[in-house]
Every structure is written in structure tokens, then in C-alpha cells.
Amino acid sequence: MFELNLRTHIRKGEHGMEIIICDDNLSERSLMVDYILKWASEKHLEIQINTCKDWMELAAALEGREWDIVIVSLDGVRGLDTASSAQPLSRRLIWISDLDFGVQAYRMCVSYFFMKPVSCQKMQRALECALKGQGTT
């Protein structure tokens, strides 16, 4: 049995959006939630953010549900495997990893790729590009 670490926030605005974050580090997940909430507040968006810690939880969350944006922030091969598995199940995938996987992200045509550490500016740019469909940077 798995436990989905669910943290939901709603911001009232013109349209709603659902985002899920997969990161095995609780403090990094919380930081990303804060960055996304700040971005949503500035854009006056209604938003729901859910979080999970690994592929098994993410796969369960993706099953039978369409998310607006899926964010995978896992290092190494685990990140590659998770991003590769999540990509066919999501319209927009943001992958956060190290430079070694940048070429693979480009080949996979993920919505956006950037390197750790995560900053508010990087996250906001990734969200904007993913929504506009601008591809990997």
C-alpha cells in the first residue's frame, strides 16, 4: 500500500490548474509548492498542487487522471526512469535533474528541463514555458 503525500492549495482566479510534483526530498517538495503558489498568486490562477515521493506514488496519481503539469525532480537514473514513464501519461512534463540528463530530456521532448538547485525564478520560467508549449531549455 502506498501513501500519497497530498498537499492541496486553491487560489481563486480565472481558470483552474492541477499540478503534481514528484520529489523524494520533503523540503524540496515544500519549497517547490511555495514557488508554484507564488507564481499562481501573481497570475491570479486557481490551482491545486499534489505531491508524491516516488514513481509508484506518481503512477497511482496519474492513473485515470489528467494533470495539467507533472513535475519530476529526481536525480540520476531514477529521475530518467520516472520522467520516461510519466511522459506518455502527461501533456506537460517538467523534469528537474542534473546536466547529465539534459540531452535525454531534449530527445524526449519534455516540456521543460532545468538543473538543480530549484529556484523561484527557474520554476516560474518552467511553468510559463510548459504552458506555452515552448519545449526544453
Where are these regions (language model features)?
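Conserved acidic carboxylate
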Residues: 23
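Two-component/phosphorelay signaling modules centered on CheY-like receiver
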Residues: 26-50
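Acidic, metal-coordinating helix/loop segments flanking the phosphotransfer/catalytic sites
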Residues: 51-69
